Amino acid sequence: MILSVCLLLLSLQQSIQASQKPHQVNPDHFIYIENALFHRGCEPHYLVSMNYWGVMNLAADDSAGGNLSRFKTEVKQLSAIGVNNVRIMAASEASGRGTQPFRMYPALMESPGKYNEQIFIGLDRALVEFSKYNISVVMTLNNFWHWSGGYSQYVSWATNNSDIPYPPSWDPEANPPYGDYTTNGSWGNYNASTQAWTGFTGYAGRFYNDTSITHLTQGWFKDHIKTVINRVNTISGVAYKDDPTIMTWELSNEPQDPPLSWITETSEYIKSLAPNHLVTVGFEGKTGEWWFKRVHSPESIDYACGHLWVQNWGHYDPLDSTDKSLIQAEEFATGFLKNLSAWSLDIHKPVVLEEFGMARDEWQNVAKGAPKSFYLYDASATTTHKDRYFQFLLSSVVEYFKNGKAWQGTGPWAYGGIWRPTDKKNAFGQAWAGDPPHEAPGWYDLYDTDPTLKIVAAQAHNASEIIKATSPPGNPSGCRSPRSKKVFANSAGSSYL
């Protein structure tokens, strides 16, 4: 009897010690870069990515506006077509003074340093689910645009003023019942004489340009970075900084004209906290060679990225049913891919096309009465132009990859999955469509039944065949070259001011 009790106590003690034992980090489990190529294990790795930005909310409890069963269904769908990476938001900000329009709700950060644990648990669940399917994750830590709160909310906090000069954004109550864009506000223009932006871009840019508040905005931002990276997943028990499911920490979604000193300070800070993860900027690459190389030049930035938006930038008209506009879009995309390939080769870093998209055949919805008596972005429109554009773009990137010309993956915007524009919004007014709250729902969505997904799947297959053809046979032990990693100092200050 005494022996049995002793054995039971010993077993309990061992169980407690095992549960308290820190998670063992194996650097070989992380995606890394060697000779300007992504690697996973012993092989080159091509990113078949997908933008799926709202998953920390989608995977949250129903009471927090989530839909976990939908999320799990969609992750399974993504895996089935060969997606091996997703880009998501790991940040969203509320005003702390009531609900602001055009953004994600509930927010992860309700006010500086105050977090909604339900949304954090949604992020925990998302990482665990992606891990089951061997899907790696790009964690975006901030946003120049307002649909997640982002820079403008940091500026609002720092100035103690909730009046944000929003640009034209989607108003679901306009043109009932279809919705329309607001007409007030401005995205802003660049004033060459003052060397500053006007409108919303100028306001949001104060996040890292206004020296009267950057000690606050950057301080809060670095606190957020530290909180997220050091978080221990409530489901897996693994700290985010030790989780190989996370491939990359991305500084921000589409920072406009970011100071090099801000990029360097922030990326080095991330590296000091999560040395096994990659870091990138989230830059579009639309402003030319000088900006592209400058933004991606710091040693603490592992790879470059590009965002390609032919309609938003005036190179495609979704109401044109002829080939003229589509050909124009392809010609612009050709030059964009060529330029970023050359610039990335110059700085010896891989590049990923982490955002691009095209609308459905909207001329069909106009014929049905849009925008007055039919929804312009209705899912009933076909995707003939979109499919041709995706086929052209993805095959081009795969060809660059095959020839060692820097491009190493694509990430369409964005996965809407089983959602459709006719679905009702949740109790928080959110659709969790592929399009964020400030844009027309359904504009750039990829639905689970779209033929476009077959093109994404073909890309995955073609890239895999290239890797098989160029990789040595077998999987020899120790095939990975040891990484020479710089140790970045953990700086709590703001040195870029």
Positions of the model-derived regions?
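Cleavable N-terminal signal peptides of Sec/SRP-targeted secreted and luminal proteins
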Residues: 1-17
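Residue-level marker of intrinsically disordered, low-complexity segments enriched
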Residues: 3, 14, 29-31, 444, ...
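General helical secondary-structure elements
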Residues: 9, 13, 83, 99, ...
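Generic signature of intrinsically disordered, low-complexity, basic-rich segments
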Residues: 11-15, 453-460, 485-488
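Active-site mouth of glycoside hydrolases
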Residues: 22-315, 326-350, 356-468
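Acidic, serine/threonine/proline-rich low-complexity intrinsically disordered regions
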Residues: 317-320
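Core catalytic subdomain of AMP-forming adenylate-forming
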Residues: 467-478
